[in-house]
Amino acid sequence: MSRKRPQPPVKPFKKKPNPLKAAKVTEIDYKDVALLRKFISDRGKIRSRRITGVTVQEQRELSKAIKNAREMALLPYATSGR
């Protein structure tokens, strides 16, 4: 007969503000390197939605734009930690 411990009340998480809506960005373009750099880590990796606070559709557009900018040599590929 094991009893379950009472769980502490779950705090509702606060949703992050969308940085694209705050900057009034309507179209994500691969040539807008200054905007794309905000969504890349210092090692060159694309940051997740959980960290950036963008929607699913915007994350897809961002990742496509970042990958396109990398192909055009506007952004660096992910670097190693060495």
UniProtKB/Swiss-Prot annotation:
GO terms for biological process: translation. One of its GO terms (molecular function) is structural constituent of ribosome. InterPro entries: Ribosomal_bS18 (IPR001648), Ribosomal_bS18_CS (IPR018275), Ribosomal_bS18_sf (IPR036870). Keywords: Ribonucleoprotein, Ribosomal protein, RNA-binding, rRNA-binding. Gene3D superfamilies: Ribosomal protein S18. The keyword Ribosomal protein applies. GO terms for cellular component: cytosolic small ribosomal subunit. Belongs to the bacterial ribosomal protein bS18 family. Part of the 30S ribosomal subunit. Forms a tight heterodimer with protein bS6. Binds as a heterodimer with protein bS6 to the central domain of the 16S rRNA, where it helps stabilize the platform of the 30S subunit. HAMAP family: Ribosomal_bS18 (MF_00270). This is Small ribosomal subunit protein bS18. It comes from Bifidobacterium longum (strain NCC 2705). The lineage of its organism: Bacteria, Bacillati, Actinomycetota, Actinomycetes, Bifidobacteriales. The gene is rpsR.
